[in-house]
UniProtKB/Swiss-Prot annotation:
It catalyses: adenosine(2503) in 23S rRNA + 2 reduced [2Fe-2S]-[ferredoxin] + 2 S-adenosyl-L-methionine = 2-methyladenosine(2503) in 23S rRNA + 5'-deoxyadenosine + L-methionine + 2 oxidized [2Fe-2S]-[ferredoxin] + S-adenosyl-L-homocysteine; adenosine(37) in tRNA + 2 reduced [2Fe-2S]-[ferredoxin] + 2 S-adenosyl-L-methionine = 2-methyladenosine(37) in tRNA + 5'-deoxyadenosine + L-methionine + 2 oxidized [2Fe-2S]-[ferredoxin] + S-adenosyl-L-homocysteine. Its main location: cytoplasm. S-adenosyl-L-methionine binds at residues 159-160, 191, 213-215, 290. The active site is at 89 (proton acceptor), 333 (s-methylcysteine intermediate). Belongs to the radical SAM superfamily. RlmN family. This is Dual-specificity RNA methyltransferase RlmN. Pfam families: Radical_SAM (PF04055), RlmN_N (PF21016). [4Fe-4S] cluster binds at residues 109, 113, 116. Coiled coil: none annotated. Reaction proceeds by a ping-pong mechanism involving intermediate methylation of a conserved cysteine residue.
Length: 360
């Protein structure tokens, strides 16, 4: 068992099994996540006998840093080896007064969004809680001495977090535990492409911030861009999102909308999007499309993006354009790929699809 898999509740269960008091969980949380201790022998306020028993039951294993890239804008991307020898990518984005860590939740992605490089890599497996919180642990260590620190976490790396809630929720609990990393729940954002059934379960287990990868204002277009929409259409997704913040005063949903030239960026799309969101407390984040090899889309012109923003604002919506960060190291939105042994044969199907289009 990996010690990083255990949040406070799991640690209490472990110590109960060992006949120990619940306060031991607090001790271990502080040693591991705040004092950065990786061996039980260094936990000096725990008896030698208990340390030995713990060592028999659990060990602390971290993802291995295979490579680090630093962008001209200060964005950092790490390639991390996880169990089984595959690799994921984690990105740190510095900004004035804040630092956002973008973590992955799967090796590859179980979904098949047509504009996302990660999706083209296929899918292998879910990450464990240890592999998710391990990204935070490693990033914290890598940033030591740089003057940068993690103030926010977004689950916007590789994978669909809501298809891995069993591992994501304990990781979130560790991030927000005052005896571990102590982030405010408002500073942690889980992004989903719209797995409605899991969104309802997420609402029962946490109240961190929610972002939704929307990308289209109607079902016909969203079916094409975000295929999971065929199973979880907008008439189910939008009410589920509204319900998530219904009992959370002063909270709002962030809607992610990638701008694709001639596809979803016309005036009528903006008006339709405003009608779709209605009076739900919202922020629309327009994302300039980040190209990748083989992509069949282009980014909307800047003038078109600004016009889209103005139309949304005319409807009373808060709308912003995301500043692209880390593009020179392929660390921007939709560009993370890692090293994935595809179990879905998605890459092979994509090649065959392109050959058919070219008439070969």
């Amino acid at each position: 068992m990996n010690l990083l898999d255990l949040d406070r509740q799991a640690l209490k269960r472990l110590f109960a099994d060992l006949g120990e008091k619940p306060f031991r969980a607090t001790q271990v949380l502080k040693w591991v996540h705040q004092r950065r201790v990786t061996g039980f022998e260094e936990m000096t306020d725990i008896s030698k006998a208990l340390r030995a028993r713990l060592a028999e039951r659990v060990a602390l294993r971290l993802p291995e840093v295979l490579a680090e890239q630093v962008s001209e804008d200060g964005t950092r991307k790490w390639l991390l080896r996880v169990d089984g020898g595959q690799a994921i990518e984690t990105v740190f984005i510095p900004d004035s007064g804040r630092g956002t860590l973008c973590v992955s939740s799967q090796v590859g992605c179980a979904l098949d969004c047509s504009f996302c490089s990660t999706a083209q890599q296929g899918f292998n497996r879910n990450l464990s809680t240890a592999e998710i919180i391990g990204q935070y642990y490693v990033a914290y260590d890598q940033l030591t001495g740089t003057g940068e620190q993690i103030t926010n976490v977004v689950f916007m790396g590789m994978g669909e977090p809501l298809l891995n809630l069993e591992a994501v929720i304990p990781a979130v609990r560790l991030m927000t535990d005052d005896d571990a990393y102590g982030l405010s729940k408002r500073k942690v954002t889980i992004s989903t492409s719209g797995v409605v059934t899991m969104l309802e379960r997420m609402r029962e287990q946490t109240d961190v911030s929610l972002a939704v990868s929307l990308h289209a204002p109607n079902n016909a277009l969203r079916d094409e861009l975000v295929p999971i929409n065929r199973k979880h259409p907008l008439e189910r997704l939008i009410p589920a999102c509204a319900a998530y913040i219904a009992d959370k005063p002063h909270r709002r949903i962030t809607w992610e909308y990638v701008m694709l030239d001639g596809v979803n960026d016309q005036d009528h799309h903006a008006h339709e999007l405003a009608r779709l969101l209605g009076d739900i407390p919202s922020k629309v984040n327009l994302i300039p499309f980040n190209p990748f090899p083989g992509a069949r889309y282009r980014c909307s012109p800047r003038g078109r993006i600004l016009r889209f923003v103005r139309i949304l604002q005319s409807h009373g919506l808060t709308a912003t354009t995301r500043v692209t960060r880390g593009q020179d190291i392929d660390g921007a939105c939709g560009q993370l790929v890692g090293k994935v042994q595809d179990r879905t044969r998605r890459q092979q199907r994509l090649v065959q699809r392109e050959l058919r289009r070219e008439g070969r």
